[in-house]
Design a protein with these regions (language model features):
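Nucleotide-activated sugar donor-binding and catalytic core shared by glycosyltransferases
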Residues: 1-442
């Protein structure tokens, strides 16, 4: 038997000491965060909802969890991650009805919108990741398996799931060199990733990054969001007010741009062009639409701007409008069906929103520069269906090519839109791949 070298023993001991210190420090950090949220809840509405929701967790679990049932636990941080996990939930309900679904959220923006999701048997917030709460939660639920969506690395949950030998999966994950797992000083955190039974990544680059730090429990399966947007399109939800406003398919139809998840920084980029081109129409779905936000949008675009909530009371308001503002939840992913060109917001701020929702309808998509975390932004541009911009001038150039009421612009819309749609269609199938690996073993 080979005697370990001193350097090897020293490295092993250093690693063991780091892990012994890391767990209590991490848990202390989570507890401190919890206290911080509680303090912030005095003035912050989102924090108030989070604290209020956490008070209800154990009552919800007591009422909804059937101790004799088998549960698949799916955790999504927020609404976007839920949409990524949704195709797998729907397939599970169809193919494996013997399982019940427990759905948890971290963010109020996910929980508040989907707390009554009909395909989940129980929906609640994820208890804070402290050892005591983790043990209590898993003792109560005792899931058959746990599925985390995209960016979820809750250290105590992962360790306890591993200790209890509960299969644990991360789906539609993306890894980048700038993440802390791959930094020299924090690379040792990579052992968290070994607690997953399997990690399903979106691309080969992510697999190679993980292999470089010794994580090999990885499959390249793609992104379930593509399956989700294809499903939304196939259901073909009709929105009569949008049809009346856009006059899609009618002789007097004018080019329509749909702006999804618009922020003030986005409006600074595109509003000026529309003032100069009265033979176009604009639909705006703001990311947030409180009264003050809507007032500012109406002031920016003037008398020709109508809110959907107003038009629902008097549909004739849209007949002479140039701008229609969608001031309600739940329509955006279907509303793209009524546009000729899409602009997806967030790229001039915190980060790009979902461009796949638009591209699936065979329309070209314009978006801002803060998109490096989204593989599809680069790939769609390479495919010829996406138009990344970095300035107002870039937007004007793209709009001049795609949005004019001319034959050449119509042809450009058709060609680039087809390329955007083809890109989406080339990415379908991630849900089936993941399902087969997890639930069709052997």
């Amino acid at each position: 038997m080979r005697v370990p070298k001193f350097k090897e023993v020293k490295g092993f001991m250093a690693e063991a000491c780091r892990q012994m210190l890391e767990r209590p420090l991490y848990s202390f950090g989570i507890s401190t965060y919890r206290v911080g949220v509680k303090v912030a809840s005095a003035k912050n509405a989102k924090a108030q909802k989070l604290i209020s929701g956490h008070k209800e967790i154990w009552d919800i679990l007591d009422k909804k969890i059937d101790p004799s049932a088998k549960y698949i636990w799916i955790h999504a941080a927020s609404l976007g991650e839920f949409e990524q996990g949704r195709p797998l939930i729907e397939k599970l309900k169809k193919e494996r009805p013997e399982y019940k679904i427990l759905l948890t959220f971290f963010s109020p923006s996910g929980y508040e919108v989907r707390k009554n999701y009909d395909l989940a048997d129980c929906v609640c917030y994820l208890p804070f990741d402290t050892p005591k709460r983790v043990r209590r939660f898993l003792y109560k639920v005792n899931p058959e398996c746990a599925i985390f969506v995209k960016y979820e690395f809750w250290r105590n949950y992962l360790e306890e799931l591993y200790r209890r030998q509960i299969p644990t999966y991360l789906i539609s994950a993306v890894f980048r060199p700038d993440q802390f797992f791959f930094k020299k000083r924090s690379a040792w955190y990579s052992y968290w990733l070994r607690w997953y039974t399997r990690i399903f990544v979106q691309n080969e680059d992510s697999r190679r990054l993980l292999a470089g730090i010794g994580v090999r429990n990885v499959d390249v399966c793609g992104d379930t969001r593509f399956d989700r947007v294809a499903d939304i399109r196939s259901k073909g939800r009709e929105i009569p007010l949008l049809q009346r406003f856009t006059r899609r398919g009618l002789p007097d139809h004018l080019p329509v741009m749909m702006v999804g998840s618009s922020w003030p920084a986005d409006e600074e980029v595109y509003s000026g062009w529309f003032e100069k081109h009265p033979d176009t129409r604009l639909v705006i779905a703001p990311h947030e639409f409180d009264a003050e936000r809507l007032r500012k949008i109406k002031a920016l675009f003037g008398e020709g701007c109508v809110l959907m909530s107003e038009a629902e009371k008097d549909p004739s308001l849209v007949d002479n409008a140039r701008v229609l503002v969608i001031d309600c939840f739940g329509l955006l992913s279907s509303a793209y069906a009524y546009c000729d060109v899409a602009y997806v917001g967030g790229g001039f701020g915190a980060g790009l929103h979902n461009i796949n929702e638009a591209a699936v309808y065979d329309v070209p998509v314009i978006y801002g520069p803060n998109n490096s975390k989204f593989i599809e932004a680069r790939e769609m541009a390479e495919a010829g269906g996406g138009f990344p911009i970095a300035s107002k001038k870039d937007f004007e150039k793209a709009a001049d090519m795609l949005m004019l009421n001319t034959d050449s612009s119509a042809e450009a819309r058709k060609e680039t839109g087809r390329k955007a749609g083809d890109y989406i269609r080339s990415k379908l199938g991630a849900t089936d791949k993941i399902y087969d690996i997890i639930f069709k073993k052997g």
